Amino acid sequence: NDKGKKTAMTALSLMSMASVGHQPIHPNEFGRAMQNALDFILLDENQDDRGYFGSKDGGRMYGHGIVTLMLSEMLGMGINKETDKKIRDQCQKAINLILKAQKVKKNSAQQGGWRYTPDARDADLSVSVWQLMALRSAKNSGLDVPSSAISNAVSYLERSYKSKLLSNGDPAEKKSGFAYQPGGAAEYTTSAAGLLAMQVCGEYESPFVHGAADWLL
């Protein structure tokens, strides 16, 4: 319980357990713990009518992105068809909210990103990477995610890279990092987050990825 953010923290715990091979269907203490955790996340009270997971526990868009990513990773892992359907339905609703929040009018530098609330008119990298990773995971799992939403989010990350851009869109600074917001200073934490998110999106050979990796090392 991190100051009440039970939904987001439970989602992180579920992903941690899944990453080492545990599943809710496993007939052991780990499987039962995951079943209970997933049942808690799927309570109707945790997701409002908009599809938002971030209001009840105070996690805002951070928590929403984390829970959505977890649900997309848990698709097909429910203990029965009813649970699988609920995971899919709630995940798609959560994805739809992310897509709607991305379309809220922002200035040109902030377009494609997200911030603390679904109606925010600005963006930052730390919130945006969770939404982007959730979108990519959901698309990989067959949910309805326009490719343009992912490419627009990647463009936002590129604008957050601490460098002027050349006419071809590549960074002038070959060795630099990602900032909290476009125009800010490169930071270790945001550079690591931006690097991870871009790789999750398949941008393995991007000069932004190589530049951030070199800067971090």
Predicted feature descriptions by range:
Residues D2-A33, N46-S151, R159-L217:
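An alpha-helical repeat/solenoid feature that recognizes helix-turn-helix modules
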Residues I41:
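Patatin-like phospholipase
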Residues Y156:
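Active-site neighborhood of glycoside hydrolase catalytic domains
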